Amino acid sequence: PGRGETILVVDDEPSVRMLVVDLLEDLGYHVLDAEDGAGGLALLQSGARIDLLITDVGLPGMMNGRQMADAARVARPELKVLFITGYAETALLDNGQLGPDMAILTKPFSIDTMAQRVRDMVARHG
């Protein structure tokens, strides 16, 4: 279970975002959320504690999830990122070229799979 870590969830689909937020809160994490890259980046560039970013790759607007994560890592180089992606969006991740402490969870996924992936990533230290 979470030990008070803070996770930022960015997804433009309210139903998906709420499902993930509810799951993470049930697991004991503190959760922040945003519906697009600009909102997510604003939180990431604030002073808020964020231990893990979970973002959909395909976000509306000027910035997709990968671009937001890359921009956030300028200010937070140690940021851990879990990308949620549909098969068609995998190309946005540069053919799977991910930096350290980045991982992909492909839709559709089970609650148990997501919970385990989050636990593994949050537990990994630096």
Residue ranges and their predicted role:
Residues 17, 60-62:
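The feature encodes the CheY-like receiver
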Residues 18-26:
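Charged docking surfaces used in two-component/phosphorelay signaling
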Residues 5, 11-12:
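Acidic di-acidic motifs
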Residues 8, 32-52, 92-93:
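Acidic, metal-coordinating helix/loop segments flanking the phosphotransfer/catalytic sites
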Residues 56-57:
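Active-site residues of response regulator receiver
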Residues 63-74, 78-107, 111-120:
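Alpha4 helix (beta4-alpha4-beta5 surface) of REC/receiver domains from two-component response regulators
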Residues 17, 38-45, 70, 115:
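Alpha2 helix of the CheY-like receiver
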Residues 12-14, 110:
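Two-component His->Asp phosphorelay active-site signatures
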